A protein has these predicted regions:
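Acidic, metal/ion-coordinating pockets
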Residues: 1-168
């Protein structure tokens, strides 16, 4: 299975490149499943309904975010209606949206995508991503064939620590 994960798509130039190149890249690499981080897609901060509609026209399976997810407050009005648009899972309970989703690829592979956010130098400071990831991994191992974690963090040390944590 070939998976494409695209980092932060930033503002109009990033959306243009994605619109112009994504299908070609997916075809040339025989991509089966695509995840794109969209947290900076609207003017460099957040996502709007219009920008989300642009992404809907592309072949994207899941969209992730990070600390800028709420920079455009209108995201609060549509995130619950878009289960493939994730916000970090380690936001407190009751936060709109979801931090994880299980989708089936075109080939029938069950892919779980978990969106997490680090704590170091991030605002707001969320619940421990390590504890939060442990809460879902055991359940997911029964429900998915592939587990992807998009860990949005500032420091290399926290990213490496999460890598070691997830490696078992």
């Amino acid at each position: 299975m070939n998976i494409l994960m695209v980092g932060d798509v930033v503002a109009r130039p990033g959306r243009r490149v994605l619109r112009e190149r994504l299908a070609e890249l997916q075809d040339s690499l025989e991509i089966d499943f695509t995840v794109v981080n969209v947290e900076n897609a609207a003017g460099g901060f957040g996502i709007t309904a219009n920008v989300l509609a642009e992404f809907r026209a592309l072949s994207i399976d899941v969209m992730t975010t990070g600390n800028h997810v709420w920079d455009k407050k209108e995201a609060l009005t549509f995130i619950d209606d878009n289960p493939d648009l994730l916000r970090p899972h380690n936001y407190p309970a009751g936060t709109p949206g979801s931090g994880w989703v299980v989708r089936e690829s075109a080939g029938g592979v069950r892919v779980g995508v978990l969106n997490m956010m680090g704590q170091a130098f991030m605002h707001p400071v969320l619940d421990s991503p390590f504890a939060a990831v442990d809460q879902v991994l055991e359940q997911w191992q029964k429900e998915t064939d592939v587990l992807l974690v998009d860990f949005h963090a500032e420091t290399t040390s926290e990213k490496i620590a999460m890598g070691w944590h997830l490696d078992g």
